């Protein structure tokens, strides 16, 4: 079940941002990809109810080694935005 949630949000994000799976899991500081990952972490955690440790493990399964603190930072980055931005994210991904 957790993997299904992870995959669902992964494909929603890469399709919305028009990036490849390889780019999503590539170590880069490209603003668009970093923002996509932050939104992905936020969705998995808040909407998908995945634990941070599960997100970290599944990211690692795809070859992207990330620490708990980086996932928490990404989640907090989106949490600190205005509520209408969060709603816009969900609407644009057809999750509302």
Regions found by a protein language model. Name each.
Residues 45, 75-82:
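DNA major-groove recognition helix of helix-turn-helix
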């Amino acid at each position: 079940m957790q993997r299904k949630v992870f995959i669902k949000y992964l494909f929603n994000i890469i399709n919305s941002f028009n990036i490849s799976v390889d780019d999503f899991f590539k170590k880069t500081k490209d603003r668009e990809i970093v923002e996509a990952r932050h939104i992905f972490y936020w969705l998995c955690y808040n909407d998908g109810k995945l634990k941070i440790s599960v997100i970290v493990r599944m990211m690692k399964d795809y070859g992207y080694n990330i620490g708990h603190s980086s996932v928490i930072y990404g989640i907090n980055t989106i949490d600190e935005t205005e509520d209408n931005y969060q709603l816009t994210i969900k609407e644009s991904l057809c999750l509302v």
